[in-house]
Amino acid sequence: MIEIIPAIDIIDGKCVRLSQGDYDSKKVYNENPVEVAKEFEANGVRRLHVVDLDGAASHHVVNYRVLEQIAVRTSLVIDFGGGVKSDEDLKIAFESGAQMVTGGSIAVKDPELFCHWLEIYGSEKIILGADVKEHKIAVNGWKDESACELFPFLENYIDKGIRKVICTDISCDGMLSGPSIDLYKEMLAKFPDLYLMASGGVSKMDDIVALDEAGVPGVNFGKALYEGHITLQDLRIFL
């Protein structure tokens, strides 16, 4: 059964969502992300995806205090991403309570460092973030497109030991337009042992059911919850 992993995106210490990674589209949903996390946990959620959007924009971890508060005040298993660009950033994330850390831009820009982290911490703790636009990997909080093609990028890191990947189709993210099921099917056909977390486009329960039926192991989503298109009660069939 697919694993439900709600997302809390943070700007200025607040729970927000963007559309297609556009910071100008920011919408604040809650001033207190800890309260959001506690509500998730109270309804049976066990995993949480926390994104430091300030960190992604400024190239170093910024909102670690929020991560720390969520980790202290809930028992959620947290994966954290956004602005993790150095050994110090990674240390801050783990010391602040993340059980897993997602690296996206760093895996493109400094593969040697990312592979070092993978060797030191292992594939249970290091997640590869593959943010995709038309099969190309995007970096720097999705503002820039790299020359990396999705499938060679994945293959390279899977060969180096990566087992967990969060793949976001940027064209879908925050748009409530439905996830890229065909893309995820293609990825799982090529890499059947991958623990793939689909991200972007989830707008209704049918989308989660479709991802589950496609064999996708995990799903990250936020806006559909915050906008009320999916309720925590709806999700209980998967929790």
Language model segments and positions:
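Conserved anion-binding
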Residues: 12-15, 20-24, 98-173
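C-terminal helical cap(s) of enzyme catalytic domains, especially alpha/beta-barrels
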Residues: 112-121, 212-239
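N-terminal beta-alpha supersecondary unit
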Residues: 15-61
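Glycine-rich, proline-tolerant flexible connector loops at the mouths of alpha/beta enzymes
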Residues: 47-65, 105, 167-177
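Catalytic cores of alpha/beta
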Residues: 74, 78-100, 182-221
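Conserved, mostly hydrophobic/aromatic
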Residues: 9, 40, 48, 93, ...
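Alpha-helix-loop-beta-strand connector modules within alpha/beta enzyme cores
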Residues: 57-79, 115-131, 176-204
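Short, acidic/polar
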Residues: 29-41, 85-91, 145-156, 208
